[in-house]
């Protein structure tokens, strides 16, 4: 684990340093969006996001274009972790991988069980995801009171969670499908791989231009266009040397970090958390869909993460890092229930053109994420304080 932390020290510390501020900014944007949506300016606020620009609403541009940049950033993070980070050592990678599988499977099972055979069964993917910015933002509030390896574990877990969410989006949330456009997008991806692997083109420009074309073709194919961001990340040249500043992947990740944290995600929060809280909000939170979301995020996440982690360590498949205790793993599992932006993103795909279900789902996500963040903070604070006594 020491080697892993040494490898990650510079990049990871820079990444983690701004998560506290980013998390606070997301909270402020959410409060602002909720306040405006439930004021006299609410209709105008909703009308702004639904205004059509170049054939798509502003909300669609945010969710399809800006979030593709977010997924590009997530893909670059994942690539770094696979090459020289927490996931580069197979044995180190196994624990967050199995934890992520549990954190995806149990919440999905809870939602599916409550909604099977109904239209809201489409929301099974909603409680699968973890909001990296919010989860690490809450953990950052604890500062040095938690072990550094817990921050690394939660980062790897959240990245694997989002990878699972990306796969779910590609497989289950594709509406109309065009094989010609999809094959064309994959052909562009193949061409970018050739530029990287064979011709060793190190300039970012051809990759960014190819990525823009791939995004357009993905959009036309019916597969969600954000997938292009992840594919582009793995097509961009990466150096196996930790923190190699000449690496195109490293340079792009470094460039995107602050725009993603302080521009893209806050805009996404403003566009997607304008939840209208009506007089029937208590009833809406008691529907099978809302209960599945809340149950999946608040209870399913920590249960799945902790249970599968414990089983795999008990049978000798994985190893618990020396400075981590099971209370830390449970705490990370609770924080994994902060679905927020990622869960809202999947909600918009699951219930297209059904505003009432989308609004109720967002309310459930918001409540579950607040509960998970608060419980996770209190849990880790309590046990860390006891450990230090």
Curated annotation (Swiss-Prot):
Disulfide bonds: none annotated. It catalyses: Na(+)(in) + 2 H(+)(out) = Na(+)(out) + 2 H(+)(in). It holds the Pfam family Na_H_antiport_1. It is a multi-pass membrane protein. InterPro entries: Na/H_antiporter_dom_sf, NhaA. It is found in: Cell inner membrane. Keywords: Antiport, Cell inner membrane, Cell membrane, Ion transport, Membrane, Sodium, Sodium transport, Transmembrane, Transmembrane helix, Transport. The chain crosses the membrane at residues 24-44, 56-76, 94-114, 122-142, 152-172, 176-196, 216-236, 259-279, 291-311, 326-346, 363-383. One of its GO terms (cellular component) is plasma membrane. GO terms for molecular function: sodium:proton antiporter activity. Coiled coil: none annotated. GO terms for biological process: regulation of pH. Belongs to the NhaA Na(+)/H(+) (TC 2.A.33) antiporter family. Na(+)/H(+) antiporter that extrudes sodium in exchange for external protons. NCBIfam families: NhaA (TIGR00773), PRK09560.1 (NF007111). This is Na(+)/H(+) antiporter NhaA. It comes from Dechloromonas aromatica (strain RCB). The lineage of its organism: Bacteria, Pseudomonadati, Pseudomonadota, Betaproteobacteria, Rhodocyclales.
């Amino acid at each position: 684990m020491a080697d892993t932390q040494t490898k990650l020290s510079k990049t990871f510390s820079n990444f983690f340093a701004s998560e506290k501020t980013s998390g606070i900014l997301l909270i402020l944007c959410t409060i602002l969006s909720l306040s405006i949506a439930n004021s006299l300016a609410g209709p105008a606020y909703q009308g702004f996001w639904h205004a059509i620009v170049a054939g798509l609403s502003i909300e669609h541009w945010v969710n399809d274009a800006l979030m593709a940049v977010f997924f590009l950033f997530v893909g670059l993070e994942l690539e770094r972790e696979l090459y020289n980070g927490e996931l580069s050592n197979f044995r180190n990678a196994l624990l967050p991988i199995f934890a992520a599988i549990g954190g995806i499977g149990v919440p999905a099972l809870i939602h599916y069980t409550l909604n099977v055979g109904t239209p809201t069964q489409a929301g099974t993917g909603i409680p699968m995801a973890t909001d990296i910015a919010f989860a690490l933002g809450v953990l950052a509030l604890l500062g040095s009171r938690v072990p550094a390896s817990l921050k690394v574990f939660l980062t790897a877990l959240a990245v694997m969670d989002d990878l699972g969410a990306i796969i779910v989006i590609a497989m289950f949330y594709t509406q109309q499908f065009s094989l010609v456009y999809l094959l064309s997008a994959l052909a562009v991806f193949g061409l970018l791989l050739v530029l990287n692997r064979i011709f060793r083109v190190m300039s970012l420009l051809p990759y960014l231009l190819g990525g823009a074309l791939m995004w357009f073709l993905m959009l036309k194919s019916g597969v969600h266009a954000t997938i292009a961001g992840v594919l582009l990340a793995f097509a961009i040249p990466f150096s196996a040397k930790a923190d190699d500043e000449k690496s195109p992947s490293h340079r792009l990740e470094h460039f995107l970090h602050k725009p993603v944290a302080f521009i893209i995600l806050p805009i996404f929060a403003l566009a997607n958390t304008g939840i209208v809280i009506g007089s029937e909000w208590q009833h809406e939170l008691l529907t099978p869909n809302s209960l599945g979301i809340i149950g999946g995020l608040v209870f399913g996440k920590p249960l799945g993460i902790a249970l599968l982690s414990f089983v795999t360590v008990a049978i000798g498949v994985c190893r618990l890092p020396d400075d981590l205790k099971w209370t830390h793993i449970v705490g990370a599992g609770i924080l994994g229930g902060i679905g927020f932006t990622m869960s809202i993103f999947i909600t918009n795909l699951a219930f297209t053109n059904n505003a009432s279900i989308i609004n109720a789902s967002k309310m459930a996500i918001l409540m579950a994420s607040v509960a998970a963040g608060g419980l996770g903070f209190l849990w880790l604070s309590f046990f860390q304080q006891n450990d230090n006594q």
